[in-house]
Design a protein with these regions (language model features):
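Residue-level signature of beta-propeller blades and closely related beta-rich strand-turn architectures
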Residues: 29, 71, 116-117, 167, ...
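Conserved blade-ending motifs and adjacent loop-strand segments that build the rim/top face
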Residues: 48-50, 88-97, 131-156
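Loop/turn-rich, solvent-exposed surfaces of beta-rich toroidal or solenoidal domains
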Residues: 57-64, 68-75, 85-128
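Structural signature of eukaryotic scaffold interfaces centered on beta-propeller domains
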Residues: 12-18, 54-61, 95-105, 150-157
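A short beta-strand motif characteristic of beta-propeller blades
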Residues: 1-4, 41-45, 84-88, 135-140
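Blade-level signature of beta-propeller repeat domains, shared across WD40, Kelch, NHL, RCC1
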Residues: 143-178
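Conserved Ser/Thr-centered positions that define the repeating blades of beta-propeller domains
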Residues: 1, 34-35, 41, 77-78, ...
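Residue-level marker for isolated small/hydroxyl-bearing positions within beta-strands
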Residues: 25-26, 68, 111-115, 163-164, ...
Length: 178
């Protein structure tokens, strides 16, 4: 059954973690939202075309969305997709995900596969995207997230991250102290 308001294919809807029956999707140039359990979607905000089809909703936060826009960088909405602001210093973002918050922090760790100031890699932010720390090295690039389009942190263990790859399965990383 076709879904009203969705024009693309291979889109992946994500649920709002707080509001029941609310879903979001990236429809190549727009963030679309549904408030009727995905029966219909309407455009909320314009976004650059060519981004990853897998947006993320921040855990336990209403309307807090992150959109990896590939060459368009990374954008964040805190109003359910009505508007987006760019996350600074991100030149490219192929995937975004969340993990357990750092000790003493309340916002989940944000992980990306992308480029920060021109340097490609796996990054994490402990401060809602204000600063980024590269957590891989040049010898461990894995071809990026490949067709899986995902990077996700462990919500139970701080610092642990998993990423799909381009032909190498799923890789996982953890802090050297674990």
């Amino acid at each position: 059954t076709p879904v009203a308001g969705l024009t693309g294919n291979r889109m992946r809807a994500v649920a709002d973690p707080v509001r029941a029956n609310v879903f979001y999707a990236y429809d190549d140039k727009a963030l679309v939202a549904s408030s009727d359990s995905g029966a219909t979607f309407t455009a909320r905000a314009s976004l650059p075309s060519g981004g990853s089809r897998l947006i993320r909703a921040a855990p336990e936060r209403e309307g807090d969305l992150w959109a990896p826009l590939k060459q368009g960088g990374l954008a964040r909405s805190i109003d359910g997709g009505a508007s987006f602001k760019p996350v600074f210093d991100i030149d490219y973002c192929g995937a975004v995900g969340f993990g357990k918050a750092a000790p003493g922090k309340t916002y989940p760790t944000v992980f990306i596969w992308g480029s920060v100031k021109g340097l490609r890699g796996i990054y994490r932010s402990l401060d809602t995207g204000a600063t980024w720390q590269r957590i891989n090295d040049d010898a461990h690039q894995y071809g990026g997230p490949g067709d899986g389009h995902f990077i996700v942190g462990d919500m139970n263990r701080f610092g642990v991250v998993y990423m799909s790859t381009a032909g190498r399965g799923i890789v996982h990383g953890k802090p050297v102290t674990q």
